[in-house]
Amino acid sequence: LKELSKVCSRSASNLGVSKPDRPKWKKDVVVITGGSTGIGRDVVQHLSRKFGARIAVLDITEPTYAPAKYGAPDILYVRTDVTNKDEVAVAHSKIKDHFGNSPSIVVSCAGVALAGPILTTSSRTFSRTFDINALANVILAHEFLPYMVENNHGHFMVVASSASYFSLPLLGPYSMSKSAALAFYETLRAELRSVYKAHRVRTSVVTPTKVRTLLGHALKDSDNNFLTPVLEPIQVASAMVDTLDSGLGRAISQPMFTSLLPYVRALPEWFRGLLTTVGNTDSSVTAESIANSFKAGYGKNWNKDDFANVFGEMESMVRAFAKKKKKNRN
């Protein structure tokens, strides 16, 4: 029964075409957004070293990479705000000029974790988070998907989060935007099947828990390292690269137990409340953990004018936390 379920899921995830359509790494071009740091950086290095892949990185931060293996193509970096359709179009033009053809693989890895309580977090912060974590997927699809559909070949991979399924206090902007990213993936897969009839264009979604990146600092480490360990970027990146190379789409859940998270929404409210209590999820994000992420360097390369209100909100929250902590000590 388990094997039958696995076969059926594989067929559904690949629009009824279960035969692998593996990339031709010497021909296909890979676009990776957010490829300068974190998970994206490890995906870039892994693809370059293992397959000598032709890669373009779209990011606002210039990358620094260890040398790829001898003979691997240079990694093209194009400074790009992925929420700006004109900049993405310019990047596409540069990619075609550099490699000679359009990308057939897109890894949408750019993301931000902006946090704060709903009542004191500005609509601008919510909007900017949605722009980067959700709307950017639409802009990337508009720019790169037509080539994939035309050739009935390619792979569109979206990095969402376990927060897509399970929301946490103070993480509203992030959780909501990642839920939207998950919905984008599901809609894209459905339209490739029913609207565009591009059954060999693969789609994948990645939903990890906390990863040891600057972004991940905003979330406290779990008390249970067995059930919810802190993931290393290379763990997630390796699973992503293996999926791309397989020529099949799938949902990548890490650690393994997170594959059960979609079922949480079907549980009675009292049981979901019990999970919250047992897992102590209400204290997963605090003003202190958010402050620690910025102290570690998170956000240092952001456009300060664009995110001015965000920094102001974060500073206010951290000051309030410090004041409360001092009061408790006294």
What are these regions (language model features)?
Residues 141, 177:
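Active-site helix of classical SDR
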Residues 191-258:
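SDR active-site lid
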Residues 161:
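Residue(s) in the substrate-gating loop at a strand-loop-helix junction
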Residues 117-118, 122-127:
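Substrate-binding pocket helix/loop in short-chain dehydrogenase/reductase
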